[in-house]
């Protein structure tokens, strides 16, 4: 600032700096500085300094006052927490005074200072505060306290786009709309000079109209003049991060706004496909796919994505040098994907959104997920012993969008005291202010009068409503009267019904007496039955004696003793059951006697109840008479009420006439007042104009000011007098209207009193009616209770009858059981002898089954080898056929060349030509014969294939016959094949030799004829007729040749079709063979289990000798484990979760079943060879960062060879080629560079290997998944152990499995680790690093595991 400037200009500039919200020394910033100083100094250790203590004692009270006056968190009511992040949370709040709804974001100061390298709160505040864009969430207020920063933003009730994509399948039309809005929003941020760096659906919010706005600018960074950014940390979400941002980790990152357009491409792909393009379950997998995006970006075949959409996605997901949007937004807007007829780029915000949220209130949070309460303790700043300045980084954060203090004032007001003209102007202004105040008062009086008129109108409306209510009440009374008459008729009807019911009850009582007499007779019968049961007991005792004798006889027998003892025990049990039945019969007799006594008591009670009912009936008749008398009196009162209502109606009509008259007068008054107001307004306008004229004259002439002033004052006084008179007249009229209103109020009160009297009478009548109805209901309830009791007694009598029938049936069944027992005793001896023979037969069957199982295994192996040999032979035959076709084609080409050479010498070599044509016909006939022979061979092959398929089906039933037939068929087939091959070879050799000799002869003859001297003379003598004949013959020969060629081509097509059919049959046979192999594997595991059971039986009973330990795998119980495990469903945990499968681990296989029913049917979905296992290990959070934290301790990983897998054809796709990635070899490890944003520790030094925002450079072995710091390799530290896993990564696969608990996971891992073979599988020894092509992901995604093709089982 120049020293020549006056103090006033300096003060003006300072004032502007204090008022400017973007200034670093505005008033809020200065207040924040004072507040921060007080917070940072107000500690006991610091107050020992006198200067600090004096400062606090001077400013602490004033700062506390300012804190109370400024905005604070207590000004808002918290409705709900709608979001939570690394630095704090987002709350839905309502302002207590204005009742407006906002979204308030809380940021912890402690967390932001702790992670200062990744906290960009200043950028977030500035973008939301000063963006002034409809595509950015607006910031209204920003304030702070000692623990938090608060940002009060507009509430977006539509939720984020993640919620929308989870609720809807997004069509391409919607995707076009939302992508266009994201493009415009990012353009707004880029135009402010910022890069977002974390564009994802979570940060795209929808307002109440469904339009999109960007939020969460905590990762934004300011661009330099060249539009670039320098950063050495990889900021963003793994799925949406660009390759250039990934490369910036640990190095000198230098990139521009094109990194945001990459995220837009990922977002568009996710909307259309439903998943991100570089999805993987581990961070290593996602990062390696992003770096290898040229090969890993693919589109699914089942999604109908347009070419324009694919083109746009590919244009976004490319290298930054060629990426769309690098040269500006206009090239994105011009893309064909955004062409449509529904909206334009300029009117996009005004169009209707595809999804408009349905909101119930201004605090509707249905589009946000419910969050659990954060129960963790919040960290705060520790009490310092010296000055730290924890509050200083946040000075100036406070922001108010509508600042009112330090409002603009005219700075030139202080200069007016110097000149006399300015003093006159001030005096005039004062007078003008006074006049304006008077006008303002008059306007207030006018408003008061209008309010009084409105109140009178409101009162009149109330009176009209009350009159309407009186009419409704009168109608209700009439309806109640009609209801009372209806109830009277109902009461008479009920009385008649009660009389009928009383007669019915008398009849029922007679029936009950009859039933009681029948029950007595039934009891006597039951007593007789009990006597018969005693006879049955005597018979039972005789049977017991017989049993004892039979037992003595059975004891004498040596081998039959065991079975007869069992039968004896069974008989004793049956006898005990019979005894228990007798006891039950006795107890039932007692129950019947008790029930008889109870029925007698009930009978006496019923008699007493009947007498009481007779008395009540007489009382009811008296009550009915009283009710009839009351009804007549009520009818008279109703007539009286009708007469009173008619009077009220007349009074209401009079009041309505009075109201109409008052309304007319009110309207007239309103017209007069409006006319006067208009005239006053016109006069005011004239005065304002005159005032302006006087102001203009004041500047020219100072002398005429006083005269104009006096004239203006006189005119204003006259006008004020006129206005006062008009006001008095208006007040008089208002007084008259108020008098009329008071009269109407008096009439209203009278009518209300009458109404109250009528309503009181009505309520009394209603109470009496209610009492009568209650009495009637009580009587009806009593009657109903009596009826129910009678019904229960009748039901009990029916039950007694049923019990009698049951007792009789049981006695009959006991007698039959005795007879059966006697019959069974006789048959037991016969059964024992038969059982001995069956035992011997079973032993023979066991030995035969063991022998059969060994034969079955050997036969299955032989059949497998034979099938493989036959498949190879078929392939060889196909190749031989193709070779033969090629030789035939060459022979035809040679014949064509011969024909052309012969056409040159057609006149000279007629004889030779005819001979050659004959030879060509012979060759054609020979070719036909050969083709027919080949057809026969193909048919034989087909027959052999059909025989093979039949043999495979008959394998299970007739193993011995099949092997003999297969051997005979093979021998015959080999002999025929050898003979055919030898014959074909000899024939072809002969043909070739003859054709060669003929060719040499023809050439020699041609040479001789050409060298003859007589050739020219004979040539001239040749006739034209001979030439024509030869031409005709040549044409015929050409036609025949063409026909032969067509026939040959047809034969080739036919054979090609047959070959294709054969190949299709081979594919079907392979699939069928695959299923058979899987079923065989499951059967083998079942056989192992059965053998183990047989071994247990042999140990306990020693029935027969079993096979040797080599055949049965002596440790079968230990080698087998089974249970429920979960596999990734469709290869995507994030969208589809886990799929449960029943897993069985036998000694050789791992079997996966969809359910237990498939296990019983031996129908596995996948089989793995244990011999092909490489590695089994528990996973870490970095391997499966998409899984929930609770599931990670339960997950483990299996690595196996491609050939060790055999699965159904449900989810198969070709094996993807290994992705080329740079890796480092060290001690057998193949390390891939990666970063960990989730908890992980170094396996070498046990130090943390992760960080949320700035993780250290790390390495992970893609074989054994060992993790370590990159520094260990760079510094050549000998801390890393050699790799324990040796296999070729290109030929290996992995699978993730989820156990039910952590203990189950440990059990599965320990069991499978024991199963891993010590030597690697053949063909999978570690390859050299030079020739090895690696994949980019150490931990393959779930999708690849599910979709890989089924490998061959060993």
From Swiss-Prot:
Which enzyme type, at the first EC level? transferase
Describe the family membership recorded for this protein in Swiss-Prot or TrEMBL: Belongs to the protein kinase superfamily. AGC Ser/Thr protein kinase family.
Gene that specifies this protein: ROCK1
| Localization | Cytoplasm; Cytoplasm, Cytoskeleton, Microtubule organizing center, Centrosome, Centriole; Golgi apparatus membrane; Cell projection, Bleb
Q: Which residues form the Protein kinase domain?
A: 76-338
Entry-annotated residues carrying N6-acetyllysine:
647
Summary of activators and inhibitors of this protein: Activated by RHOA binding.
Annotated spans, Disordered: 1320-1354
Q: What is this protein called?
A: Rho-associated protein kinase 1
In this chain, the stretch annotated as Interaction with FHOD1 covers 368-727
Q: Which residues form the PH domain?
A: 1118-1317
Please give the organism.
Answer: Homo sapiens (Human)
Domain (AGC-kinase C-terminal): residue spans on this chain = 341-409
